[in-house]
Amino acid sequence: MDEIKLKALAKINLGLDVVRRREDGYHEVRMVMQTIHLYDQLLIQKSETPGIQIHSNLSFLPVNENNLVYKAGKLLMDEFDIHTGVSVELNKRIPVAAGMAGESTDAAAMLYGMNQLFGLKLKRKDLMERGVQIGADVPYCIMRGTALAEGIGEKLSSLPPMVKCPVLIAKPAVSVSTKFVYQNLKLNEQTPHPDIDALITDIRNSDLDNICADMGNVLETVTIPNYPVIAQIKEQMLKSGAKASMMSGSGPTVFGLFGDEETARRARAEMKASGLAKQVYLTSIYNNRR
């Protein structure tokens, strides 16, 4: 095998709660993660040129050790003493720096692809153990599906598959710093926390209406006052018939869950016409695990 082509799927958070701020500065979280059908594509090829060469359709992306794809490749090359060069064609569709684990899922695909390409015979759990060295979301992106993430996001528990439904994605032009969001998060009695356990029960019961009612993201308490366009996009989605709308991760991307394809398609057109979002995609829930 000289090349492998892979899809790197995005994630959304159906629920995101921050439990506490640790003494080391990290935050302990409880998140319900969900893979969706929106994806980047990676073509990974063996190359006569030594090292790792990355080419992307987005000129502003780093193509050196500052890219998690590069880090993932180098980690396996160093561990298994691989001297053959690797070339990566990275076609980005997932919004960048958007709370959808775009870079983490690309790194996960790189680990998976290198494992196949060089016959390393690493099992999924082996890849996940290596993934956590690259980034907290990488192990989940290797696993995929519906999962509860705890700790700093690295402790993963599989959940039953989420109900399939259309998902509308809208990313505004603003950039949101994850560091800024967590630094400005106030954890006190007034902070509205989502009920993650209730959300998990709803998922187990395949109850889309209750899932939508119990969804919540505590980080919106920081982002919405600072970036009003996030609330405007949520409002637009609900006005267009979404059963629920919420920010994913630390934002600024907003997603909406819909009961039927026709309403979702109409909502996509209305979102594009509103001018609130720079990138708009209609996709769906993805439940297959690796």
Describe the function of each predicted region.
Residues 16, 40-44, 137-141, 147-148, ...:
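Short beta-strand scaffold segments in enzyme catalytic cores
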Residues 143, 148-244, 259-262, 268-272, ...:
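Conserved, helical-rich catalytic subdomain that frames metal- and/or nucleotide-binding sites
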Residues 89-118, 136, 243-258:
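Glycine/serine-rich anion-binding loops at beta->alpha junctions
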Residues 34-35, 132-133, 139-142, 158-163, ...:
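Solvent-exposed alpha-helices and their adjacent loops that cap or buttress functional pockets
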Residues 123-133, 215, 265-269:
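Short, well-structured alpha-helical segments that form the helix of a local strand-helix-strand
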Residues 14, 42-44, 69, 103, ...:
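Residue-level signal for inorganic ion chemistry
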Residues 48-62, 110, 205-215:
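Short, basic/glycine-rich phosphate-binding loops at helix/coil junctions
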